[in-house]
């Protein structure tokens, strides 16, 4: 048994908290995350796409739940109301939720013991709005970088987006072990965007995560560089998870 400290990470395309029963249940998303009990979680589709574009799981609900804190990226999207006369006043009158959780739907949640050293919100080349989020974290006095991403449906754009993410990592001032995770929209392990990894990273053997009712495709992936050893990995397929989204969450435990 190794004495090295471990880190459990998870990735979850939560589909704006809308389950396969077509009900929006942010509390159900948090319950699924509690079942997994990861130290760091990358969420995709964590913000709404229309109107105020607020968090699909409200900040207040996350705070009340108490297990996680959102990583603050201090960015926000251009919102529909900002294009209208008196938009800010309308937000107040309608009590709209306009506080986003992440960047283009990508968010990171960490447990309270995880330190946050630095953060970045990345713009990705795209046909439709896409982004990624990056956080440099401190876990048991060991630094680790985590990137959350949701790549394009187009293979050509996925490859460009992965290249942009890897270039952003290379430009970082401090070198540290790195984990990429999210919905890659890539059906094949030999897909073009994953070829950009050039052997510098390994894909954790999590398994198929889509569709949650009958998983046949490993669209969601956790990718770690060779400084990290993968101790275990899998798909979380509890009854609650099968209902909460059309994707199942994936997880991996790595040695730091």
Tell me what each language-model feature is:
Residues 57-58:
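Short Gly/Thr/Asp-enriched flexible loops that form oxyanion-binding sites at enzyme active sites
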């Amino acid at each position: 048994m190794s004495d090295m400290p471990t880190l459990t990470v998870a990735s979850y395309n939560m589909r704006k908290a809308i389950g396969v029963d077509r009900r929006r249940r942010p509390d159900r998303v948090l319950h699924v995350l509690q079942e997994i009990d990861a130290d760091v979680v990358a969420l995709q589709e964590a913000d709404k796409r229309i109107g105020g574009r607020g968090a699909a799981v409200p900040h207040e609900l996350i705070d009340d739940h108490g297990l996680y804190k959102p990583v603050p990226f201090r960015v926000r999207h251009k919102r529909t109301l900002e294009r209208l006369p008196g938009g800010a006043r309308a937000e107040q009158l309608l009590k709209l939720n306009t506080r986003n959780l992440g960047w283009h739907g990508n968010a990171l949640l960490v447990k309270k013991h995880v330190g946050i050293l630095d953060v970045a919100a990345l713009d990705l080349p795209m046909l439709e709005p896409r982004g990624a989020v990056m956080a440099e974290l401190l876990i048991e006095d060991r630094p680790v970088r985590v990137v959350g991403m949701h790549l394009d449906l187009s293979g050509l754009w996925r490859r460009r987006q992965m290249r942009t993410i890897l270039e952003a990592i290379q430009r970082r001032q401090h070198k540290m072990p790195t984990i990429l995770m999210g919905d890659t929209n890539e059906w094949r392990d030999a897909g073009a965007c994953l070829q950009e990894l050039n052997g510098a990273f390994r894909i954790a053997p999590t398994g198929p995560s889509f569709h949650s009712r009958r998983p046949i495709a490993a669209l969601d992936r956790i990718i770690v560089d060779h400084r990290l050893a993968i101790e275990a990995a899998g798909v979380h397929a509890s009854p609650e998870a099968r209902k909460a989204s059309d994707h199942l969450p994936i997880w991996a435990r790595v040695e730091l």
